[in-house]
Structure formats: structure tokens, C-alpha cells
Amino acid sequence: MRTRKIMMTTVLMMLLAAQAQENSIAIDKVGKRVEYNPMIFGQFIEHFDNQVYGGIFDPGNPLSDEDGFRTDVIEAMKEIKTPIVRWPGGCFVSTYHWLDGVGNERQAVYDKTWQTEDPNTFGTDEYVKWCRKVGCEPYICTNAGTGTPEEMSDWVEYCNLTVGKWGKLRAKNGHPEPYNVKYWSVGNENWGRHELGARTVAEWGPMVRESAKLMRSVTKDAKLFAAATSDPNWSLPLLKEAGWTLDYISIHGYWDPLYHVNNPASFIDCMMKTDAPERDIVRTIDILEQAGFGGGKIKIAYDEWNLRNWHHPWHGDLRRGFDYEARRKNDIASTYTMADALFSACFLNACLRHSDIVDIACFSPIANTRGAIRVDKDGLTRRTTFYTLFMYTNYLEKYYIPIKTSFTSLIHGDKQTTVLDAVLTCDKESKRYVYAVVNKDPEQVVDLKIDFASMGKRQPKELSAWVLAGRSADDYNDRGDEHVRPEQRKLKIKESVVAIPAHSITFIIVE
């Protein structure tokens, strides 16, 4: 009972403190302006369920082009200015052999990871062609599970050389010009027991080192990644052995763990998770610095991220087997509410705050499962997360500017977070500023005081803004009803204070 009283007193004190404070933002004059890499708005696609087959690739569908690519998906991806797409996995890649997916003599294979058949009709050539139509960079993740360093470097040869066995095979397959694929990753989540071909800490560093050496011998200016985590016990030995061969370390994050039971967290519970991605980023930056690769010598690629993990019961339990029908629960429209939209905005804000080191991020995945786009045979739906990505790729300016913030708390049980999350961007001349502000409160409008003088501006009578809010915190989009989308509004200002709508992402424009 005494413990409960202490906890209640602590919570009450935090609530009173929160009520006493004001929410304010101002430019940090000491901070350094950074031109962030738009690759942080990247995407990911895996041979899982209906992401590729029946998703982005559906030959014979009236909505597909002559190559079998869904044109509505391509157009939607152009709307969010997709800069890069990671493929083919994901866990799938750890039993994928790229040679099975090229040429005219392809055969379907049994995918041991997801325990189903893959027809191999969407392989390297189709992927690169699809990326060209989307207008994005291809980013290939190689098989470091059941594959070998030589197989990885052969794949680089197939994509990038005009000479040798594999470059000539690409030409024979109808593609005489090299693809010049720049981004390559050694492995996927090889630290995990769920991964087929998982490695020990002692095995992983040498595996990465030798793979990277072979791959770079083919393409000198390749950008090379390796599967890592924010755990120093894994990543420090990796960097000690192989850091000198790498440009990036790859980390992943899903914060609503729905592997076995599809019981999505509530809006407020999701908001309590919004600080977690930045903690992982900071831990990973600390690992890089400890290993002697700080200051951008090696950068971070958050190349799989989403609020909610994919629902695939019993994956990794080889005795129990895979529940195929359960995968359909990933596509329930009502799952993807304003919680997903706001969490995604907070994630992107964290990437921007550390954009000197976080250089690439890939939302996981682009289509179906937990994707920003839901695709069926008759059309598609842009989920709430799609419009988060749309706002960040269309309305932000190109330079991140550090800001000083003072935010009150949003408290739920024994957990708390700041009620607001914000970043500031500007154009090259520092004439046009855009604040990206997230209000995590499910019900309350939150007043925010803006220091206009720190931007060299006078307080205007009103501000232009783009707002993504929906009708409630649990609002979502479905086929034929995409009402959760950005709205242009005018925000009134009184004594430098502007009202931020509840459960919203608000982009405030200051000119």
C-alpha cells in the first residue's frame, strides 16, 4: 500500500508539473544546420505473403502494365517520392539464391523461411526494372544465412559488370547495360535465432569482412551495409572485425510485438513507445563512437522499421509449423490508425535530429502486411502512414535545424512521454521554415509557443499549416474512404502561441 501511495504521489507531482509548464520551441543558435539525406524516407519489400506477388507484381491484372507491375502502386510510390527500396528481404533472403530468379529457365522453389512456394517470377531483373519505373535506388540485401561470400559477390557482378561469367549472363538474359546497383547489405538479422543461417558473435564479423572484401573487389564505390543491432555485445565485435570494410550498419525496429498474437496496442500505449526509436539510435551512435567509427565514418541505416511487427505465428518454431491464414490479419484496415501515423512521424523526427549519422531508413513494408499501401486485385488504399510519408517528402524543407524545446508530459499509468514532438527544417537561404509538430494527446488541443525572433521573423497574424488528424485518434482509411489525409489550414496566433490539434501531425510554415 505504501508503494502504491508513493507511486500515486509521484504521478500527481508529474501531472502538476506538466500543468505548470508551457510548451515552447526556439531555434538553438549553437546547433549546426544539416542537409539531411532524403533516403530516410525509403521503403522495404519482402517476398512475404502478398507483398510482392499480388501486391507490387501481379501479371494479368488489368491494373498491371506489360511487365506485370501494378501501375497504381507505382504512382502511389511516386507521390511519396520513394528514394530507395530494400529487397528481397528480410528473413526471406537467408534462404534465397539469386540465380534461381534470373533467366528463362526459372523454377519455383520452396521458401524455407516462410514455408511456402516462391514462383521466382519476380527476381533481380524485374526488381531493378520496377525500381527504375518507381524512380528509386535499388538496395539489395544478400543471403548471409545459407549463402556464401562468393555468391554475394557474384550477385554484384551480375548487376554491375559487363565482363566475366555473371555480367555476360545478364546480357544474355536481355540486359546488356549494367544496372550499377550501388547499395548492398551483407545479411539480414543474422543475430537472431529466428533467422535461418543465424550466426554467433564470433562468426559474424569475419563473415561480413570477407563478404565485403569480395563485393568491393567487384564495385569499388559500392555502399556496403551489415546486419547489426543497438546491442554492443553484437555490434562492437562486428565493427572490430569488419568496420573498415563498411559504410553503414543496419538496424531494425518494431515496437508493437505482434508476432504470435495479433492484439494491436491502443493509441495511448503506442504514444508511450514514441521515444524508443531515438533511444536505439543514440545507443547505436555510442557503439560507433566506441569502435572508432563515430562522426559519420560509418552511418546508420534503419532499414526496417514500423510501429507494429508483422503477425506470423510460430515463425521460428520449426516443430509447430507456420499459421498461414493468420497472416491475413496483417491487412485488417482498422489496425492502422492515427497511432501509426503519429508514431511514424516521431520516428522520422528522430532520424532528422540525428541526420548527421542516420542516413537511410526503410519503412517496412511499402505494400500489404503492415504497409503504407494496402493492395488488392481491384485497387489500393493509402493508409494513415502513407500520408505521414507524403507530408514528410512533400512539405518539409531540405535542411534540418536544431531547436530548443520545452514540452509538458503525457502520462499513462506508470509511463510518460512528451506531449509534443517537433523538428524544424528550412530552405537553403533560411527564408522559409517548416516545423513538423506531433501532438500525441488523443483528445486535447495543445498550445505551443513559437519563438519567431530566433528565426529572424516577426509574429504574423496567422500561419499556414498542413494537418493530418482524422476524426478521432482511432480513425483509419479503408477502400473508398480515405478521409484521413492532409488538410491545409490557417492557424491563429495570440502572443506567439498556436493551437496544435489533438492526435495530429501539424506542419507549420513560417515565411
Describe every region a protein language model picked out.
Residues 216, 263-270, 330-331:
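Short glycine/proline- and acidic residue-enriched helix-loop micro-motifs
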Residues 253-269, 315:
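Active-site His/acidic residue clusters
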Residues 202, 318-319:
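Glycine-rich, phosphate-binding/catalytic loops in enzymes
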Residues 1-8:
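Bacterial N-terminal signal peptides that target proteins for export
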Residues 12-20:
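Hydrophobic h-region of N-terminal signal peptides that target proteins for export
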Residues 245-248, 267-272:
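Active-site cores of enzymes that catalyze phosphoryl transfer or operate on phosphate-rich substrates
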Residues 319-326:
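Active-site gating loops and adjacent loop-to-helix segments of metal-dependent hydrolytic enzymes
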Residues 20-234, 239-248, 277-278, 282-313, ...:
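Non-catalytic accessory regions flanking glycosidase/transglycosidase catalytic cores in CAZymes
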